[in-house]
Amino acid sequence: MKKNSYNATLLLASALVLISSFNALSCFGQEKRVVKQNPKLIIGIAVDQLRSDYIQALQNKLGEKGLKKLMNEGLVYENVTFDLDNIDATAALAVLATGSYPFYNGVTSASVYNQEMIRQQSVFFDKQYIGNSTAGNYSPKALIGTNLADELKAASNNLSKVYSIAPNAEEAILAAGHTADCAIWLDDKTGKWASTTYYRDFPQYVVRQNYDTPLFVDEKKATWTPVYSGGHIDIMPYCKADLLPFSHTFVKDRRIAYPWIKTSPIINKAIVELSKQFIKQGRLGQSGTTDMLQLTLYAGTYQHLSAEESPSELQDIYVRLDQNIEELLSAVDGSVGLHNTIIYLTGTGNTENCVSDLTETVAGEFVGSRCTALLNSYLISLYGQGSWIGSFDNNQIYLNHKTIEQKNLRLADVRHSAAEFVMMFSGVSEVVSADQILHEDNNARLTRLRNSYNKNFGGDLLVELQPGWQFKADDASKPQPQTRHDVAPGPAIIFAPGLVTPKHVTTPIDATEVSPTVAKTIRIRAPSGCKRIPLGFKN
């Protein structure tokens, strides 16, 4: 009897062991099926001035396979904020690509003042390199640290193919970084796809397209008419006018005006068409390694007008942008497969000329040329004859450092004297010197200024006006309304089937959190200047 009981116990124990082993193997098998291989293709899409509220307002005019697909099947952060002053698309794109602000990444705006050459120039101007299909000289050397493209190159031991396409040189170079195969943009004068000899690979199929099928072979093809005419202007709830038909030809002085084209849907269509050639002829995502394609598109106003001056055009830009993204997704799905692709899409957080101020609300105008002329006279009275002012640009006064050195003066002393004088001008609420930004203890206001500043290109004085005041470069120029902070937050979307759970997050996030979150998703290091941790991965 005891023997039978012992045998029964032994059989039961053996059965439990077998069941446990089977369950463990089953769990292991299930876990193995869940783990995905590295993506074949990563596509980063940055859309200049993309607004979350405009996307929501146009839901009834968007298709199901473009922006809606990304938003319905991706992780969506609806409100990305930039802790910056006077933000432009270039500075915003640098923040998104590096996970750090200009104080660390070196890129304050598309155009910067060169103290040595005493002139404005591209932030990426570099005379050591010549252009491909352009007269410009560029390199990414002004970008401090790495970006996402650089980190993918490092992770793959330089095997990944990385390309960037954008309307302008600065945008293309920012996304490409230091180690990409090529950065490509549309040249303002020739309308050809251009690059810089800094990058080693300017694909032959792009060269052929420049000569065989240029962007426009004649003026008649350079036209823009709306998809919809009639009906309400959905993006502007307080505008009572209906959508109006329009036709823009982009011809100026009998030549095609390519800078105008860059503020229309035509540039987005051209970039998507070229990206399809990279996927097809360049075989991106089809070589056994993870490749990357960075695209910059446009969703701002036509010719940089205010929204109320061109509402029909602005709404059409969004409708066509949605169609372009649908076309891109279809091309990717037909070649690499969307299930093998990670896509992230971001806006730039800035809006050019959002709404003009009413005349009654304008308190006054601050004219930069008058300020610098009077300031120069004041410094002459203090320190003697000389050209004391270099430039006034983007709310910043640049002193002439050569004159200060020749007079054997301390730069900090001259900055202090100049700041005290400018502070007496009508409409000025604050004047902050570079020394304060670089060396004084932080407060919330100084932190924002510091984020926006970089010692390599920053001015000596930063001038802030009182509410209602407007900047004018000189008496003949148009007034520039003050930038409103975070007036139009844009989204950040991560589309990664099987890796991220579709979800909408309305809580605002900082723009520097986007890059480490994308890096975590694609399993690479965050860029070298990034100090944030990924969203959704916090303890």
Where do the language-model regions lie?
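Bacterial Sec-dependent N-terminal signal peptides
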Residues: 1-34
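Short, structured active-site-proximal loop/turn typified by the sulfatase FGly-forming signature C/S-X-P-X-R
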Residues: 55-104, 161-165
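Secreted, luminal/periplasmic, and some membrane-associated catalytic domains
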Residues: 78, 88, 110-136, 145, ...
